[in-house]
């Protein structure tokens, strides 16, 4: 073995070896199955640190289950990521001065698949660098032909069941990408704005009602003024009209319970760009006319503002109203504004014909399942309540997207007819140009990735999957939708357990984003420290559901831990077998410690408590195995047993440190680690006194450290009522460079063991001088404080706080003097 740990040399070919040997591709059908689907990363770029954390957590579970004797399937997949990928491809085309409309749909899709192929290859190389135990023979892509077949079947089946429908509704609209969005694709952000208080004069009157709005660009779509029917003023205004400040049209004053009496004047303008407003307009049979188009520009109903960008128009319209004295006041105002999760621009509410999924049935199915015996287990459990809260208030899911990259909707149109089927009904029928929301295909991943409906072999064996590991930020995007899709189509939950991890934040606790420029490339870290070091840092610093703070110093510490393991392995490997040695008390002691850590790991793995696993493993290796057992082994030299326990330790460590453990297993034992499983039997133990021995050794070492006694000078000690055997005394002497003597005079007590030790004369003399000086100083300070406190002038004139300070000093000095005068033992 090399003298120094070299992560690059150790890791560079390991994953390819595992692939070549098909350790995670060949499946033993006689074993109990355990399956995980890797959450498909988007083919929009390279993996980030969050992907690394997610992959490491799953991979550690897969490797642990394999070593437990399961038939494991870790299925790799990638997501076509509709909006995100189309944005990237359009940006790439723009560099060549091309628009997607210039090249047409077919060529655009060809470019998109080329993009996908490029980044899929990059992602696969990164998976290999991470060391993920994936079954590449089962790899899937959410836009491969099998996925297309499944998506079409699911859409058609849900349409025929009346669950998917087409309707005209107010929907979330991304004006930059020009596509509909579902509610979970909209991020609400607190945004500073201006609140304009606009005068709407009553018809044929100098009286006006004051309307507060930040969105002057929507004024041209106003079709009524509303007031709450419980407002005492309502009876005086209902059935009256106001004159619109811009168009001069008559607008009726109507009532609706939605209107907040406490907001501003209590009057509200009813326009076409709010879901609540649209609902009120529909209830009152009022027309819906939009003032903002699909691109975020004002429409032809907006007079001189037609064609103006919406936010520019907001300012210009406000200026016009102010010029005409139609604004009574302007205030700074902050409120939540919806932004597109992908393009980061403020959304619009537009009335569009779109495809929707009815959510009432699916919500009930999930809620019922969560209360059943066959429910999904959430780690941490609090996220079950989060999901319940979401399912109780969910809206119908908008699933159509005005994109080209994705699953084209299997709906066909001719004149006023609509048919939903796979193939064209005949001549002159046109397919819907829209595609489905990316999450539609992701929602059916747990069964579509296993071949449904074309084949059932894998589905029967591996569905429901054993575990889903994902970020808590997509529980509504993805987890909820997989849940109801599985319940509806498979009549069973899609996974047994869900482990939700947090985000990785920078050292200032900020989310890592491109805009902040604080993202960390995991591949750079792997080059610098190794995949094992990065894995150990990430998984042992993650608690289910909580965010992680990135800390490069901890990654360096992880590398040092790997280096420690390397040095331990070198120590064991370099020793030569001599004669056979029987088990010593130290062997039994470390066996007991190992049995306990093995049990801890098993216990914590059941709840995915990786931080606790890391603490127990680290404590065993650093404190028990390295600091004590290997020291004791220099006395007993039971090399055979050292290799027995180290072999079991490497197996236990493998899920969390796969590259290094695999390498060491091959070097020391000339065997492949992944061709082994955990031992079922515990290591044999016997009652022993090694823990007491350690206490004595530590006490003598601390005595040497405290008084800075040279390591070349023997410490003389004596143990009162000594129960230790001569072999124990020999071990103490060897490991502390000391000798048993009855002339010791200073005593320390550890767990009722009285240990007497003598100080070398030169040190004792120095300590005596220091002690005398301290006593003299304390006596002087005590005398000074007493004199001051007996002085009546000081007591009467000095501030109370000063007097109390002197009393406290006197008490402290008296106590310190007593301790010094009584000092005859070493604590």
From Swiss-Prot:
It catalyses: tRNA(Val) + L-valine + ATP = L-valyl-tRNA(Val) + AMP + diphosphate. The keyword ATP-binding applies. ATP binds at residue 514. InterPro entries: aa-tRNA-synth_I_CS, aa-tRNA-synth_Ia, Anticodon_Ia_Val, M/V/L/I-tRNA-synth_anticd-bd, Rossmann-like_a/b/a_fold, tRNA-bd_arm, tRNAsynth_Ia_anticodon-bd, Val/Leu/Ile-tRNA-synth_edit. A motif ('KMSKS' region) lies at residues 511-515. A motif ('HIGH' region) lies at residues 41-51. Catalyzes the attachment of valine to tRNA(Val). As ValRS can inadvertently accommodate and process structurally similar amino acids such as threonine, to avoid such errors, it has a 'posttransfer' editing activity that hydrolyzes mischarged Thr-tRNA(Val) in a tRNA-dependent manner. ValRS has two distinct active sites: one for aminoacylation and one for editing. The misactivated threonine is translocated from the active site to the editing site. Belongs to the class-I aminoacyl-tRNA synthetase family. ValS type 1 subfamily. This is Valine--tRNA ligase. It comes from Mycoplasmopsis pulmonis (strain UAB CTIP) (Mycoplasma pulmonis).
């Amino acid at each position: 073995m090399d003298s120094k740990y070299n992560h690059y040399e150790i890791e560079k070919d390991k994953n390819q070896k595992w692939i070549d040997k098909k350790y995670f591709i060949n499946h033993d059908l006689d074993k109990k199955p355990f399956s995980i689907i890797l959450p498909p990363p988007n083919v929009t770029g390279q993996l980030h640190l969050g992907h690394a954390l997610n992959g490491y957590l799953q991979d550690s579970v897969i490797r642990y289950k394999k070593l437990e004797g399961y038939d494991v399937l870790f299925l790799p997949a990638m997501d076509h990521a509709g909006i995100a990928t189309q944005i990237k491809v359009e940006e790439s085309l723009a560099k060549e001065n091309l628009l997607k409309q210039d090249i047409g749909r077919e060529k655009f899709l060809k470019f998109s698949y080329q993009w996908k192929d490029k980044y899929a290859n990059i992602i696969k190389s990164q998976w290999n660098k991470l060391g993920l135990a994936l079954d590449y023979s089962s790899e899937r892509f959410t836009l491969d032909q099998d996925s297309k077949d499944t998506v079409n079947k699911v859409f058609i089946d849900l349409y025929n069941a009346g669950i998917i429908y087409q309707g005209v509704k107010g929907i979330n609209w991304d004006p930059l990408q020009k596509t509909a969005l579902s509610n979970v694709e909209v991020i609400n952000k607190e945004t500073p704005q201006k609140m304009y208080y606009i005068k709407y004069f009553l018809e044929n009157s100098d009286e006006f009602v004051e309307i507060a709005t930040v969105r002057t660009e929507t004024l041209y779509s106003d079709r009524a003024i509303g007031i709450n029917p419980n407002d005492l003023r309502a009876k005086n205004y209902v059935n009256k009209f106001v004159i619109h400040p811009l168009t001069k049209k008559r607008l009726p004053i109507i009532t609706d319970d939605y209107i907040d009496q406490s907001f501003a004047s209590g009057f509200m303008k009813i326009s076409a760009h709010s879901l609540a407003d649209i609902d009120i307009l529909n209830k009152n049979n009022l027309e819906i006319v939009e003032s903002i188009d699909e691109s975020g520009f004002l429409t032809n109903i907006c007079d001189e503002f037609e064609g103006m960008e919406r936010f520019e128009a907001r300012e210009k319209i406000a200026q016009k109203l102010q010029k005409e004295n139609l604004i009574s006041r302007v205030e700074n105002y902050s409120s939540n504004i919806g932004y597109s999760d992908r393009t980061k621009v403020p959304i619009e509410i537009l009335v569009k014909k779109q495809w929707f999924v009815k959510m009432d049935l699916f919500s009930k199915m999930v809620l019922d399942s969560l209360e059943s015996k066959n429910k999904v287990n959430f780690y941490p459990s609090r996220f079950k309540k989060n999901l319940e809260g979401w399912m109780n208030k969910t809206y119908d899911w908008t699933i159509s997207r005005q994109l080209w990259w994705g699953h084209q909707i299997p709906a066909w149109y001719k004149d006023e007819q609509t048919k939903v089927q796979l193939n064209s009904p005949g001549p002159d029928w046109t397919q819907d140009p829209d595609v489905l929301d990316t999450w539609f295909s992701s929602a059916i991943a747990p069964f579509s990735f296993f071949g449904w409906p074309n084949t059932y072999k894998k589905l029967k064996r591996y569905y429901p999957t054993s575990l889903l590991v994902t970020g808590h930020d997509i529980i509504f995007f993805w987890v909820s939708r997989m849940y109801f899709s599985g319940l509806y189509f498979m009549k069973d939950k899609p996974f047994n357990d869900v482990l939700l991890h947090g985000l990785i934040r920078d050292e200032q606790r900020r989310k890592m984003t491109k805009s902040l420029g604080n993202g960390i490339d995991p591949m750079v870290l792997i080059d610098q420290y190794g995949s094992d070091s990065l894995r150990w840092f990430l998984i042992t610093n993650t608690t289910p559901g909580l965010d992680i703070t990135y800390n490069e110093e901890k990654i360096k510490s992880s590398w040092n831990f790997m280096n420690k393991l390397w040095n331990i392995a070198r120590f064991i490997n370099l020793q030569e077998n001599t004669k056979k040695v029987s088990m010593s008390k130290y062997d039994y002691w470390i066996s007991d410690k190992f049995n306990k850590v093995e049990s801890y790991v098993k216990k914590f793995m059941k709840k995915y408590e990786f931080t606790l696993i890391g603490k127990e493993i680290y404590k065993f290796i650093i404190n028990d195995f390295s600091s004590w057992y290997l020291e004791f082994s220099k006395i007993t030299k039971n090399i055979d047993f050292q290799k027995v326990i180290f072999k079991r330790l490497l197996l236990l460590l493998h899920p969390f440190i796969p590259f290094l453990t695999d390498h060491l297993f091959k070097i020391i034992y000339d065997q492949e680690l992944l061709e082994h499983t955990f031992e079922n039997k515990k290591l044999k133990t016997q009652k022993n006194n090694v823990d007491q021995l350690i206490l004595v050794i530590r006490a003598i070492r601390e005595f040497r450290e405290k008084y800075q006694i040279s390591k070349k000078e023997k410490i003389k000690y004596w143990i009162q009522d000594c129960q230790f055997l001569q072999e124990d005394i020999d071990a103490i002497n060897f490991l502390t460079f000391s000798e048993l003597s009855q002339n010791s005079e200073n005593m320390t007590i550890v767990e009722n063991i009285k240990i007497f030790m003598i100080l070398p004369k030169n040190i004792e003399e120095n300590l005596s001088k220091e002690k005398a000086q301290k006593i003299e100083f304390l006596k002087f300070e005590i005398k000074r404080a007493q004199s001051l406190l007996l002085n009546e002038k000081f007591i009467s004139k000095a501030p109370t706080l000063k007097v109390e300070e002197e009393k406290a000093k006197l008490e402290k000095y008296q106590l310190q003097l007593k301790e010094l005068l009584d000092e005859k033992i070493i604590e």
